[in-house]
Amino acid sequence: ILFDESQVEQGRNFSNKIWNAYRLVRGWSIDESIAQPEHSAIAVKWFDSLLSQSIEIIDDHFEKFRLSDALMHIYKLFWDDFCAWYLEIIKPGAGMIDRKTYEETLIFFDKLLKLIHPFMPFITEELWHNIEERKEGESLMMQQQPKANVYSEEFIKMFEEAKSAIVTIRSIRQSKNISPKGPLALF
């Protein structure tokens, strides 16, 4: 196996991403008076479906001993889908989040840590113990891998279309020097 320093750097960057996502989520305060916003409910439904679909794909990669493919799928799921989309959608403006979205997010984080653990055991073990209080001797290493729930491929597809539209709009705004903060009329 050839040593490539850029792979070490990529691993470091991924570790930082995982740690910072954890810090972001744990930095939120729950406001019991806030009902779950519609955009958060949609994001939860999408990510739950996507996570279940991904678990099936990752399980298939493991069964066929395609460890590199499994890792790449987990990497993209965490970095692109969980951090860049899900967390950005649900991120509360004032640091206060509704309980339902917060609890679902911790469940997702727990499942993601279990998926990442075979490849990055130390950081995932540390964060898993910090997510909630664990019993003496309890270890992420001894936990079952998450199982896929029933999910809607149609919902995933619809959400992907919405993401594509958003990316296109952002690209047009940037190419035309239109402020990303200003309102934009779409037809």
Positions of predicted regions on the chain:
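Structured ligand/cofactor/substrate-binding pocket environments in proteins
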Residues: I1-R26, M72, E103-E125, H129
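Long hydrophobic segments that form regular secondary structure
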Residues: S52, R66, I74, I169-R173
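Hydrophobic residues in alpha-helical segments
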Residues: F62-E63, A94, R173
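Acidic, turn-prone loop/beta-hairpin segments
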Residues: D31-D59, L87-V167, G182, F187
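Conserved phosphate-binding loops in nucleotide/dinucleotide-binding enzymes
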Residues: I1-N13, E63-K64, S68-D69, S152-E160
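Catalytic adenosine-cofactor/nucleotide-binding cores of aminoacyl-tRNA synthetases and other
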Residues: I1-S40, E132-E136, Q174-K181
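Short amphipathic alpha-helical interface segments
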Residues: D69-H73, P180-A185
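Core structural elements
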Residues: N13-R26, V44-S54, L71-P92
